[in-house]
Amino acid sequence: MLYLLPVGAQQADGFCLMEISDSIYMRIYGKSFKEDCTTSRTDLRYLQVMHYNKEGEVCRGELICHRTIANDLLAIFKELYEARYPIERMVLVDEYNADDEASMAANNTSAFNFRYISGTRRLSNHSRGLAIDINPLYNPYVRWRNGKRMVSPEGAEKYADRSLDFPYKITRNDLCYKLFKKYGFTWGGDWKNSKDYQHFEKKWVE
């Protein structure tokens, strides 16, 4: 689905950054922006970016994130686009009714979503728009419970084996990893007690 940009949006070569307009707010309210959302609408920004998929096709993507990381994300995705780095899909998680599992299973890259960390009652950094998940199906969230490995999303179990070669895989030698680290993000693949290979986040610093 194609969405028209509001008048006055800052654009350059298919990339734009803007405040949350009324039309965008209508798309997210009650979904990623839930009624009890503690993140202010004014703290969020809407981004449109260009990206390639693994077939080399040019795609238009969109994200919502916290204002403090918006310029960083815009710069990162411009560099990824120039390098033809493959990202399969990038639409608002609201297209999946803010269902994180469904979005991940579709290998959809997304950022803001007011939700809890999978398997817990703690708010995720996605709730403030300070985290982003890149190509999540191929870079799953892996944790252990009572000695049993748990992999999210469902269907991503084979991609939890990081010794294998497959498309969209993020490693420390990967351009995506290097760019996010360059801009001060931390990677979930470096966590000790669990691994979230899709996940990059940044602390809120004004």
Name every feature range the model reports, one short phrase each:
Residues 39-104:
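Active-site acidic/histidine clusters and adjacent loop/turn architecture
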Residues 3, 76-80, 84, 180, ...:
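Hydrophobic, Leu/Ile/Phe/Ala-enriched alpha-helical segments that form helix-helix packing faces
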Residues 87-88, 102-136:
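Mid-length scaffold segments of soluble, non-membrane domains
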Residues 2, 39-44, 105-107, 125-127, ...:
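A generic structural signal for short, non-catalytic loop/turn and secondary-structure boundary residues
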Residues 25, 29, 33, 67-82, ...:
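Active-site-adjacent structural elements in enzyme catalytic domains
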Residues 10-57:
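N-terminal module-boundary/linker segments of secreted carbohydrate-active enzymes
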Residues 1-8:
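Hydrophobic h-region of N-terminal signal peptides that target proteins for export
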Residues 117, 123, 129-206:
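Catalytic cores and adjacent binding grooves of peptidoglycan-active enzymes
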